[in-house]
A protein has these predicted regions:
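Short, Lys/Arg-enriched N-terminal segments with co-localized hydrophobic residues
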Residues: 1-11
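N-terminal, positively charged regions that mediate nucleic acid binding
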Residues: 10-54
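Glycine-rich, mobile lid/loop segments that gate access to catalytic sites or pores
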Residues: 20-23, 64, 89-206
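N-terminal low-complexity, intrinsically disordered segments
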Residues: 28-31, 82-83, 117-119
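Short, glycine/acidic-rich hinge or "gate" loops at secondary-structure transitions
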Residues: 50-60, 172-178
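Short, charge-patterned binding micro-sites
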Residues: 55-75
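Short, conserved charged micro-motifs
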Residues: 75-82, 149
């Protein structure tokens, strides 16, 4: 599970230019938070009547600390075990370090029920009356530069970290930890990538 952190807006001309994309691994603090939040959202979606369940959640991670906060709404009688899900997520990522271990990190929850005012706005049956709440959705674009229809710099940046994670989990490379980052710079001519000019990979290690 990787993310593109920055996008440079450029004009597509016949001139040559450089375009750089960056990826972070599942062990990067930003992604740890994303994955914990995803585990919780998935739990709500697995319950009855998922279309009426609501999750607006923030996760904070620091040295041996995980904090979740926000507001939710699930079916009557449903109690989400936030701590269990957070530990499962961190275990899946692979953190078993002295300063951050899935078994013994300190967990705090400040999650509460959804505001009735927000519920009233987002629950309207008529689309004309339906509000947007305060959550947004980010989006990207598809192109023909790669087989998966992603821009080439971010595709190769992702691919590097996927192989690094595989090597770590299969122990073909020893001593590396979950937090890593890659950056790939390609040279373009017009709208076509023609050359790789720089690759940077950094990883947490023993």
């Amino acid at each position: 599970m990787l993310t593109q952190l920055s996008i440079e807006i450029i004009s597509m001309t016949d001139k040559k230019y450089l375009f750089t994309s960056e990826s972070v691994s599942e062990g990067h603090p930003d992604k740890v938070c994303d994955i914990i939040s995803d585990y919780i959202v998935d739990d709500f979606l697995s319950q009855s009547d998922p279309e009426n369940n609501r999750v607006a959640l923030e996760t904070l991670v620091t040295t041996n600390q995980v904090v979740v906060s926000g507001e939710v709404r699930g079916p009557d009688g449903f109690e989400c075990n936030y701590e269990k899900l957070a530990r499962e997520a961190v275990k899946w990522i692979g953190y078993e370090q002295e300063k951050f271990h899935w078994e013994n990190f300190n967990f705090t929850s400040f999650v509460h029920g959804q505001s009735s005012d927000i519920a009233m706005g987002v629950d309207a049956k008529d689309n004309k009356d339906q509000g947007a709440g305060d959550q947004g959705i980010m989006f990207g674009y598809a192109c023909k530069e790669t087989p998966v229809l992603m821009p080439a710099p971010i595709y190769y940046s992702h691919l590097i970290l996927q192989n690094l994670a595989k090597a770590r989990k299969e122990k073909t490379i020893s001593g590396i930890q979950p937090d890593s980052k890659s950056q790939v710079t390609l040279q373009y001519e017009g709208s076509k990538p023609i050359n790789c000019t720089e690759v940077v990979v950094s990883t947490q290690h023993n």
